[in-house]
Amino acid sequence: MTRVAVIGAGITGLSSAFFIKKNYPEVDVTIYEATNRPGGKIKTEKRDGYVIELGPESYLGRKKIMTDVAREIGMNEDDIVTNQTGQSYIYAQNQLYPIPGGSILGVPTDIKPFISTKLITLKGKIRALKDLTMKPISITEDDISVGHFFRARLGDELLEKLIEPLLSGIYGTDIDQLSLMSTFPYFKSLEEEHGSIIKGMKQVRRERQKNENNNRVGAQGQFKQFKQGLYDFILKLEAWLKAREVTIEYQTTVKDLSSTQQGYNLIFENDNTIFYDGVIVATPHQVFQKWFENDPMFDYFKSLNASSVATIAMAYDNANIENYENGTGFVVSRTSQTDITACTWTSKKWPHTTPKGKTLIRAYIGKPGQRIVEDCTEEELVQIAQRDLSKVMKFQGSPDFTIVNKMIQASPQYHVGHISKIKEIQAHIYDNYQHLQITGAPFEAVGLPDCILQAQNAVEKLIPRIR
């Protein structure tokens, strides 16, 4: 019998085991997890009728692989919810500005609301519209920073006031260092195909509207979640795996890997050794890079920085809080003097998460290059969030409760050149480590469906070679 070890029980590791048992049910699978729980960054807390996400909030619905897996592990349509649509805002120049209608990731596709917005000056609007007549931007070494690309296409002002707040929060990276081809390569493809980012995104918008019309569905949110929280997905996935005789060993740390001609010996903290025909590594890069110190190809991961972020959830009685605006949340421009980077009015965006008569807010703290998350206590982070939020909202009294979740060095920073280096490393692994695959956020996109897709790809690269 072929035996495979999966190291790491986050969503990538669990999904790796899922695809092994789905497509190769005869393979014996054991998952090793250093902590006492599955799910990695996914954490949901239920309290007093609230469903509170402390890690990732949701996933992009058009990336259907996560919804497909949810159905396969026994979740039904009633378990899956879509976010409420509503106005989103940019906090800039000490006030909230509505994100102009028709904007997609900050790129204008409807000229009228873009021209009428007060967020961008007339000079900034004229500069952005030059995109319509510019030639494609040439790039060297097959990559360019997101900041460089959008500055060249749309100008500094639109980038800094609209695009940067929306994009940098996803990856926690300085936009002038963030790799375009590792994160948003389709922007470059649209530019080359249509000669303009604005024209390209207008076509994307038309296609989305056409699909909505064909499906006879009105305006819907882009994001999905689960009624009982994202962690419900993790627990059901864990149960599905256990029902198929997958063993999950918690609080078990793999200290090292030792290769043989037939596979790998896993060496544990107590120096016990267990042999496996194949191994899938789905841990943070800070963990696995030390196992390959003798291979210079893995030196890249020593210099791969990761950013920290804290989420601060605050629950209030409706009588004790006043939103100035009726919307789902806001992101903060880089020029604003705040420590929070974004805020979600969760009770409006996800009504199922909050009891009637209550308001749930989630603030985010953590900017590239800062150490505020590492250096501040949880109480200090709550005070910082309340200080910054008081600039746009009125609070009376204290919240019913607050919950802080620190995610230290949790988001790998994809700097320019990342994707070409990762492709080189992946080819090296395939050519030189027949019994091994390494996957997860250090390699490619960090969204939950992307992690599941990477797991599927890792399984299909590994299992046929070792059976």
Feature roles, as predicted:
Residues 2-31, 463:
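N-terminal Rossmann-like FAD-binding beta1-loop-alpha1 element of flavoenzymes
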Residues 12, 37, 286:
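Conserved Rossmann-like nucleotide-cofactor binding loop
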Residues 21-47:
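Glycine-rich FAD pyrophosphate-binding loop
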Residues 48-137:
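Dinucleotide-binding Rossmann-like beta1-alpha1 core, especially the glycine-rich loop
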Residues 83-84, 250-252, 258, 440:
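Short loop/edge segments at beta-strand edges and connector loops
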Residues 101, 326, 345-467:
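Conserved flavin/dinucleotide-binding core of flavoenzymes
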Residues 128-252:
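Active-site/ligand-binding neighborhood in enzyme catalytic cores
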Residues 253-361, 368-374, 391-392:
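Mid-domain catalytic core of redox enzymes
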